[in-house]
Amino acid sequence: LATNAEPIIVSMASAVAEIPSAFGIRCEYLPGENRGWVSRSNWDLYIRDRIVALIDETDAKVLVFDGVIPHAGFVAARNARPAVKLVWMRRGLWQKKVHRFALPLQSAAMDYVIEPGDYAFAYDHGPTSKRTEAIRTAPVSLYQASEALNREASRNALGLDQSRPAVLVQLGTGADDANEKMTAALKGLIGWPDLQVVLTKEPIDKSGKSLAPEGLDLKVIKFFPLAKVLAAFDAGVCATGYNGVHELLAAKLPTVLVSNIRGMDDQEARARWCHDFGYALRANQADLNNITETVKELQDPNMRASLSFKCAELPAPIGGEEIANKLLKIAA
């Protein structure tokens, strides 16, 4: 997209600061409502005004919202500049929560709805699955085989020992149940000879207490995009979010999926599909012992080989290119 247009990413996540250096794309950070700095109504006005200012500054033709619920300020910005086309990048696999009742109204407010494909689409029986307004594409992933580093280069980039196995663990922490899942998963890696356990943030609770059991060699890394160096790892343990699944499995990384059921995303449906068809192992997110035992299965080289071989059957995640082309046509 960047070769034919001037995309600008506006995000409420502070991690957006990593994108310009990694991809050469301009980014703007907007503090989210959860900061609590202003009331919700004033925050919506702030979002509206900032986006309108960006539209005017850049002569933007298309405004794309990538998320679950389009913010009122976002829609108000387009209403203030009605010539701009409004697109909702709406992923599928919604849980049947209260947000579903706003779907018809929110969808009608859009000029276009685009649904990035999901490996687990066959298990999508949620509120979006029977709707017809979305343009569906192939799956989207930051992992692209043509851009990924090989194993040696990936390990050099991360500072990992070339001769020792390494496992990537990407699980959230903070809430008590999330902390318990992290500890249970790490326990499943005990006994793997010479293992390097790689995390993207310290496994600690809110008080600073370590969630990791004794006997593991932990390494906390900072690298973006991590999808570029997945060849460094022998296996992975991650939540069953859209990005994690479509990066790790696309990279043929043997993976245990531990779902987070708090959000709108139906991670359990995605995990069941991946497990039922042999692409990954699904741990029972409600059973800590099962999480430990399922992660322990990754220590079996035959299991890892089987999962990796099966993942080679997955379609290439080329949805990003498809979506870019659609947006260019919308802007024309």
Please report, for each region that a protein language model flagged, where it lies by residue.
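Conserved nucleotide-sugar phosphate-binding/catalytic loop shared by glycosyltransferases and other
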Residues: 3-53
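A nucleotide-sugar donor-handling region in carbohydrate enzymes
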Residues: 91, 95-98, 103-173
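C-terminal alpha-helical cap of glycosyltransferases
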Residues: 296-297, 316-332
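Donor-nucleotide binding loops and adjacent catalytic segments primarily
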Residues: 149-235
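Catalytic binding pocket for nucleotide-activated donors in carbohydrate/polymer assembly enzymes
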Residues: 244-292
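Acidic donor-binding loop of glycosyltransferase active sites
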Residues: 231-244, 253
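Short N-terminal targeting/anchoring amphipathic segment
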Residues: 52-70
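Conserved donor-nucleotide binding/catalytic region of nucleotide-linked donor-dependent transferases
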Residues: 281, 286-314
